């Protein structure tokens, strides 16, 4: 059960085009390069550090309690009459492809704008974003697991910082591009 909910909840980085500009050629735009989000998250964010404990069905109040206590959560949820709070939200969070059921849904570029009903597996991080972006008449948590959160081991975080510094130093050295690209 836990393995399957973890598999269902898994999603990679949230990369998506603004639904208002997808497929359009936009001139005179700017961008910037983040040197790397992954080392930052590995060093500065907390992760589940104990085995997940099965809680079972829970109320939204229970979930919010666990979240306030800094617990890592994974759960199966059902949402009724789901809709975006802001119809102009450029990148809605819920991907239809990650739902186990999605009934009478309005989909734009693969993302759920509204649905009569949907089921999906989510983490506490997903749920925070969903609660911020969407309204629903009812949210039912049919199954939930929790783990204590904490930082990854100090030695590992220090190693990540060391490699990050070495990588960024290569970036500015002429003739080292091949080594930088490998890192």
Predicted feature locations:
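Conserved acidic
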Residues: 1-183
